[in-house]
Amino acid sequence: MPVVHANGVDIHYRISGDGDETVVLINGVGDDLEGWAMQIDPLVAAGLRVITFDNRGVGRSSLPPGPYSSREMAADTKALADTLALSRFHLVGVSLGGLIAQEYALSHPGDLRSVVLANTYAKPDAYTRAAFEVWGQIAEAGGMPLMMRQQAPWVFSPAFYAAHPERLTAILGEMERSAQPAWSFAAQIAALLTHDCTDRLGSLNTPALVIAADDDIIIRLSLSHRMFEELPRASWAIVPGGHAAFVENPDPWNRAVIAFIDQHRAAVH
């Protein structure tokens, strides 16, 4: 798969589809580009070219020393976009990816037609901060296999546990197989802890969709809604599921994203 050298790191990426407009998907903490498996085909079927990539610190991208920041990771995304000559594209970020997408939209609004901020926040509150701090501590003290097993009840809903035990087992197996080193996971956690766009949200004028999940316990609906209220051109959507709603309930999540992007395609304006 292709790799570009961008912003001082090697970024592993994949292009799917050949639509006349492009959407770039940004992963959450610890996820590589395979995490978007449930989104690729629906987005391609909607006429989009889809670009996925591994953030610094995970997958086949470089693993530079940490800690990382959301602003630094947004610069990685910008360097990738410039290398691929992207312009006027749609940007989608989930969790940590949503923090990165905020920084991108604030720094490079002219690049974007729209931005989707899913299961994310403008600044962590005390509860979310404490949870992410523990994730980093578990990874460094007990290793990534333990971290992946511990993480699951935080990111998947009780309903998903009850209805899809075999699928959950397969997902956990894949998470453990693809896990990054504990130190680079902790480096990504640092970006979650230090992110703060609260004083700048009012200047984010790119059309935005904020998605929250009704059973997300780590980035609660109320925390995402707090961000939504500060955005001048934002829409709001609630989908069923936990923090990983895009994995456990991909259909409503995908429909919300595609419907929003359709409103902001070039042909509409």
Where are these regions (language model features)?
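Conserved HGGG/HGGXW glycine-rich cap/lid loop of the alpha/beta-hydrolase fold
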Residues: 9-62
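Active-site loop/oxyanion-hole signature of alpha/beta-hydrolase fold enzymes
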Residues: 51-52, 56-92
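Gly/Ala-rich beta-loop-alpha elbow adjacent to hydrolase catalytic centers
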Residues: 93, 97, 101
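Flexible "cap/lid" loop of the alpha/beta hydrolase fold
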Residues: 102, 106-107, 113-142
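Conserved alpha/beta-hydrolase catalytic His-Asp/Glu region
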Residues: 126-128, 145-200
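Short beta-strand/loop motif that positions the catalytic acidic residue
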Residues: 204, 210-212
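Acidic catalytic loop of the alpha/beta-hydrolase fold
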Residues: 215-219
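Catalytic active-site module of serine/aspartate enzymes centered on a nucleophile-bearing elbow/loop
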Residues: 234-269
